[in-house]
Amino acid sequence: MLKQLKLGTINDLAILLSLRQELTMAKQNLQPYKRYPQIPDYAKYSKLVAVAEERYEMAQKKLGMEIISFDFRTNEVKFTIMNTGEMFVVRKVLNGLTNKFEWMVM
């Protein structure tokens, strides 16, 4: 059975994915400084991680969605809608007719 998603849901998912990517990048920037927390850059990057985590959590609550997993190789995202508990798997694929990337429900 193919589940239909509203365009707003896909837009919300894109926002949530960008915030998750921001959080991932902030954590990667902090990684080299974890061994030496006395370095001033550690405080700067740990604050960026805290802000990114807060923004991501707020967006999850506001949008009512939670990303379960994201596979960079296949561009496949598994997420749930918190209100209904429905789980969706979407994949970003290239449409051969329009030559644009589109989200397809799996």
Task: Locate the predicted segments by residue.
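Non-transmembrane amphipathic alpha-helical segments
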Residues: L16-L19, L23-Y33, A52, A59
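Amphipathic, interaction-prone secondary-structure segments
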Residues: M65-V93
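Intrinsically disordered, low-complexity coil/linker segments enriched for acidic/polar
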Residues: T9-D12, Q38-P40, N95
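Short, non-transmembrane alpha-helical segments in secretory-pathway proteins
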Residues: K44-Q60
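Charged, low-complexity interaction regions
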Residues: Q31-Y42
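A short, surface-exposed interaction/processing loop segment used at functional sites
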Residues: L97-M106
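Short, charge/polar-rich alpha-helical segments
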Residues: M1-T24
